[in-house]
């Protein structure tokens, strides 16, 4: 039995592959998936982890078909970048109610003075570090959805994270909402490049019933991507193992590594050896470069934290906002501008924080929080309803006004081509978050050597100087 108050890291640990439990295949000779990942972890740790929708593990688990697609994105296809803010983000200090006296009374010393925020109207300001999002707002390309949550909220990291990742509030989740979208999108075909988690494991929301995303580390693949003669000899030995071995185990593991070699050879040219030192910045740069390479990725995802600021929030939260801002800026510095009408970002977190600060200069697990959808095709504005803070005591929690599944469904239908009712097993209320469908022609030219950035978003790094203890660099 899991402790209801396990840490953010522990919750992610249990809700990600390879730590999640896997059902073994019907083939009596098939490897247990968890054991397989342990056996080949050294090789995969330097390259990729993929699921049953890919040739990499399908072959290893005796599931047959080794075909996979690595093709350019289709005409009119949108690319959705999903950012997980793990630990529970303080929504009140992200989208600040600058004219609400209750906010300043309840948040106390944690509250951000109105004059230090980035105002978007007379009642609301963005966190002072979110300068890039302010630029999107000024271009009518930032949708802020306030009051997102679900009925009877759970304050456990694990339980609430599982609900948000699964896209369901009841039952034991066996798949995630984006994974189920991937099931429908692929319709049984094999495509390793349709969705990717830039990280070292696959979180629940990227796992479908029949298809999974691919996990790509925020680094250049080394296994399978080295050109030196001695490495090429080693790679050939692996190929020979798969081709000639009569031993089932050697043949299956060897074939999995052959797939790994082939995948690395396609991805490695898009990723430089030197990446930014800040983790989220590096992850979003990898995403931008994979999009530039036009391999067919529809849903790149990444998560970071820790946002679980029970103490020391004045030092922690500004850094998280600074990381987010720097990562988005770096993404658009690297992205070929021809892709901007194809890309939309969205954020999620398992819950918000309490309106009342605690004695440790922090906040505790809350319920509702605002989230962002932004990009050149987003319909800028405020959506949903800001929860009232009136009458909330020390352990009072804000009421939600937008079901998180309506938030998800609005993105699925408005940006990914539809199918929300199948993915979420319910009808949704469309929030109308998009001004236009994905547009523009995918570029066919070479990947740009130098970052350029899209029109309307400055590529000059910087911050307005709001009190973080450490300055972050987005340089390589």
List each model region and its residues:
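Feature marks hydrolase-like catalytic cores characterized by long aromatic- and Gly/Pro-rich stretches
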Residues: 2, 7, 96-97, 108-131, ...
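Pro/Thr/Ser/Gly-rich low-complexity, intrinsically disordered linker/stalk tracts
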Residues: 445-475
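Extracytoplasmic mature domains of secreted/periplasmic and thylakoid-lumen proteins
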Residues: 70, 123-229
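Anion-binding catalytic surfaces of enzymes that hydrolyze or transfer phosphate/sulfate esters
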Residues: 239-335
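Active-site-surrounding "flap" and adjacent substrate/cofactor-binding loops of secreted or lumenal enzymes
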Residues: 76-79, 89-135, 139-143, 155-165
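N-terminal secretory signal peptides
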Residues: 1-32
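Structural recognition of the beta-strand scaffold that forms the well-ordered cores
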Residues: 82-84, 93-94, 143-146, 195-197, ...
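N-terminal export signals
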Residues: 35-62
């Amino acid at each position: 039995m899991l402790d209801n108050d396990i840490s953010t890291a522990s919750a992610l640990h249990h809700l990600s592959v390879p730590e999640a439990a896997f059902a073994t295949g019907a083939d009596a000779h098939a490897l247990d998936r968890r054991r397989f990942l342990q056996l080949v972890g050294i090789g995969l740790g330097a390259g990729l982890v993929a699921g049953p929708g890919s040739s990499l593990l399908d072959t290893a688990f005796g599931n047959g078909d080794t075909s996979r697609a690595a093709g350019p994105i289709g005409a009119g296809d949108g690319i959705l970048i999903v950012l997980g803010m793990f630990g529970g983000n303080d929504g009140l200090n992200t989208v600040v109610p600058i004219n609400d006296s209750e906010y300043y009374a309840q948040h106390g010393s944690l509250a951000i003075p109105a004059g230090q925020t980035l105002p978007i109207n007379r009642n609301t300001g963005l966190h002072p570090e979110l300068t890039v999002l302010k630029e999107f707002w000024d271009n009518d390309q930032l949708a802020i959805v306030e009051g997102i949550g679900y009925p009877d909220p759970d304050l456990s990291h694990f339980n609430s994270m599982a609900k948000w990742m699964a896209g369901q509030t009841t039952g034991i989740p066996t798949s995630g909402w984006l994974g189920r979208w991937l099931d429908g999108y692929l319709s049984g075909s094999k495509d390793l490049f349709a969705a990717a988690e830039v990280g070292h494991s696959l979180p629940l929301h990227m796992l479908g019933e029949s298809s999974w995303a691919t996990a790509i580390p925020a680094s250049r693949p080394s296994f399978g991507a080295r050109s030196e003669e001695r490495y090429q000899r080693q790679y050939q030995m692996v190929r020979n193992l798969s081709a000639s071995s009569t031993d089932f185990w050697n043949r299956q593991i060897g074939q999995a590594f052959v797939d790994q070699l082939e995948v690395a050879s396609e991805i490695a040219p898009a990723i430089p050896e030197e990446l930014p030192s800040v983790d989220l910045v590096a992850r979003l740069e990898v995403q931008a470069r994979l999009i530039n390479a036009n391999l067919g990725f529809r849903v790149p995802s990444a998560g970071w934290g820790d946002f679980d600021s029970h103490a020391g929030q004045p030092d922690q939260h500004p850094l998280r906002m600074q990381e987010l801002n720097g990562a988005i800026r770096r993404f658009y510095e690297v992205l070929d501008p021809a892709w901007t009408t194809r890309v939309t970002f969205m954020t999620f977190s398992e819950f918000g924080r309490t309106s009342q600060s605690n004695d440790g200069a922090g906040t505790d697990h809350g319920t509702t929080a605002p989230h962002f959808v932004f990009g050149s095709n987003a319909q800028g504005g405020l959506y949903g309803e800001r929860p009232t803070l009136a009458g909330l005591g020390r352990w009072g929690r804000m009421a939600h006004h937008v079901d998180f599944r309506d938030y998800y469904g609005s993105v699925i239908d408005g940006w990914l081509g539809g199918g929300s009712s199948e993915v979420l097993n319910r009808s949704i209320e469309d929030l109308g978050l998009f001004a236009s469908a994905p547009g523009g022609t995918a570029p066919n030219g070479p990947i740009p050597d130098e970052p350029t950035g899209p029109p309307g978003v400055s590529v000059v790094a910087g911050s307005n100087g709001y009190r973080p203890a450490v300055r972050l660099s987005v340089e390589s």
